[in-house]
């Protein structure tokens, strides 16, 4: 039977998805299922790892069945996943010892504060992992599980526990425990991986008291990791051939193969990445240095700005405040007025990411008067997304010395034309929206396809990607500068709030 398709596994923060692509990049079928968000305490976020696997395996079967594709027609599987979220499980039984601790979870802030008391070690972490010390990353989450789950430390020291980011957890289950591996992009998000030596960093592991025996093997992003167990997908042994964290996969899906090319993904969070080539560039502006992907043992590096709350702010004005009935309504209300009338909303619900890295910042709405209406709050929420992206991209310009030559965008929020136009205005730059919005999944599929010869080279991949719409700046630079100064003032009001008022 001919191998005409590649299956993308897209395991996100709020849902598990499976998408079948053909050789022209067309989507044959999408299946999606949401799963439970667990909030045990304020600032804590967890997922049930077994529910993640259950929903993911379910949507894979659903996509195949309703897409009328037989497992034997799948040339390869590409995996892309929410990053930093980590699972610790029993090596023998495959059972998690605790819920997955999600990237948004702030429970390890105190561990990070302890690390920050040693400036030399903080410097070591930045120079060798490319990351800042923050509760966002996987390393301190693993330490918390080992320190707080009864019996976990003893089992880990005895070599009976394994850990992994979500890609590793999925690979383990797809292969029924035969493969315990991750790729360079996901490894680079743990705060445990040395992006210079391309090895797990023993000094950091020792500091956090994490046994190296728990850690997965690190492989190329485009490489056959193993095959699905014969009991997983209708008896077929399908190569798992592409793996990348969601933002890295999106950069690859946008075909940002050359140094200086950048993309921004608008999802639960907002993530801008710029390809900086085959050598890491370290930021003076609060950006992260990360491995974008690796092929044939050679990494491509990127600068990244991470914004924690983007799509979630629209969910909040819908579900928390009841200002809109649907996310789509936000565009309608935002365009009913000419401006926010000086209102700014800073959605620092779980702190601020790049370039501020303030774990204790909290959300604020400033500039309210008796004239403030629902429309002003809604528009301010949308504008906050664009302002945060500008914060990040301005830092990239400073660190690389490169002007932004257009920005490639993807994610759910790119369907909001008001937001995309405002983003173009505030950046004073062209915004390109591709016809295929499933760019993250496409990137995973591209990586898998290259590994198994489904596509011959990157030039062929570029021919698949086409542009749907280009947004050009319509606002003058003086007005933009004025509005951006207001945003910066609003951010200052949100900083250190939880620290001051806890």
UniProtKB/Swiss-Prot annotation:
Pfam families: FGGY_C, FGGY_N. One of its GO terms (molecular function) is glycerol kinase activity. It catalyses: glycerol + ATP = sn-glycerol 3-phosphate + ADP + H(+). PANTHER family: GLYCEROL KINASE (PTHR10196:SF69), SUGAR KINASE (PTHR10196). ADP binds at residues 13, 17, 268, 311, 412, 416. One of its GO terms (biological process) is glycerol-3-phosphate metabolic process. NCBIfam families: glycerol_kin, PRK00047.1. Pathway: Polyol metabolism; glycerol degradation via glycerol kinase pathway; sn-glycerol 3-phosphate from glycerol: step 1/1. Sn-glycerol 3-phosphate binds at residues 13, 83-84, 136, 246. Inhibited by fructose 1,6-bisphosphate (FBP). Key enzyme in the regulation of glycerol uptake and metabolism. Catalyzes the phosphorylation of glycerol to yield sn-glycerol 3-phosphate. It is an enzyme of class 2 (transferase). Belongs to the FGGY kinase family. ATP binds at residues 13-15, 268, 311, 315, 412. GO terms for cellular component: cytosol. Glycerol binds at residues 83-84, 136, 246-247. Its EC number is 2.7.1.30. It comes from the Bacteria. Keywords: ATP-binding, Glycerol metabolism, Kinase, Nucleotide-binding, Transferase. This is Glycerol kinase.
